[in-house]
Amino acid sequence: MKLGIVGLPNVGKSTLFNSITKAGAECANYPFCTIEPNVGVVPVPDERLDVLAKMYNPQKITHAVIEFVDIAGLVKGASKGEGLGNKFLSHIRETDAICEVVRCFEDSNVVHVDGNVNPVRDIETINLELIFADIETVNKRLDKARKNLKADKKYQEEIDVLEKIKENLEKGISARAINFNEDEKAIVKDMFLLTTKPILYIANVSEEQLQDAENDKLVNEVKEYAKKENAEVIPLCVKIEEDLSTLEDDDKKEMLEALGLEESGLDKVIKRSYDLLGLMSFLTAGEPEVRAWTIKKGTKAPQAAGKIHSDIERGFIRAEVVSYKDLVEQGNMLAAKEKGLVRSEGKEYIMQDGDIVLFKFNV
């Protein structure tokens, strides 16, 4: 699953990407420094693995991962091919969700592509380009569906949905903010529209702003805008995150405490991105390895087993499941079994986040 980091030029995208992935992507104070997208595979912070590691003393700890893509800065007119518009739109089309970085800090040394700091205007610049691209997609689909309608009346339903989307897009409303019934959702899913992708806004603030981000005027303007799409906003200072990313764990913890922060902004971004993609983790634990496995929310036990090996899914018999909370409270698996907290679940069991599982199978 890919999450695209987008934003106008010079808002801190590549610095954020470097900090998340420690990949050292080129970062410069001029537009379009990122042309081909940089890609980084990032571990998802999960303190549960550390707790289980103390319990099992494994040879190996393996975190779940997600993929971040740093996409070239977008400018007004991208949907018409301005700047790196066509490349930007094709790269974003390949992602599953969007992390939109928006500048909320003043700094005369960092050029703003539009001359001054106005986060809502910047968000609208990007979102309008995505909307324009989607209008073009919808118009093409409408033309095709109307031609096909003459031969097959089933296309009327698709036309109705397309017209509903077009009407909203032309009012500046992203497709993700439209209410669709289940039948409509199935049609929309097949359209691969840019504005249906889930979105997370990252407000890049100064160190001073971060100390009182809850009351910051610009951050709150972004939050008000995000409410329209039921989107979340994470304020962070990319400069601080860049410094934190170079530190060892103990030094990082010390710096966070000095700043009055419980966790880094990057950890919040990674965790929320994982959630935004509709993902969760089940866990396996033993002496060889303690591991988090990535599945979509709503996945049933046999399909979860298939993430470990296709043979386990094929020969699935049952899953022995205990919740992370119950295991930790009891202290070990034997005590959890004695209390009747380890359950035997069948093929229809829907996995829950933090389930610790042993799959039984036969092939």
Predicted regions and their residues:
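Conserved G1/Walker A P-loop phosphate-binding module
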Residues: 1-111, 138-140
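Short, surface-exposed secondary-structure boundary micro-motifs
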Residues: 103, 361-362
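C-terminal-of-GTPase-core extension/linker across diverse P-loop GTPases
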Residues: 2-6, 17, 144-350, 362-363
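Structural motif
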Residues: 352-357
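Conserved metal-binding segment of the jelly-roll/cupin
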Residues: 70, 359-360
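Amphipathic alpha-helical transducer elements in NTP-driven molecular machines
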Residues: 32, 46-49, 62-68, 82-95, ...
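Glycine-rich, flexible loop/turn motifs
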Residues: 23-31, 38-40, 48-51, 80, ...
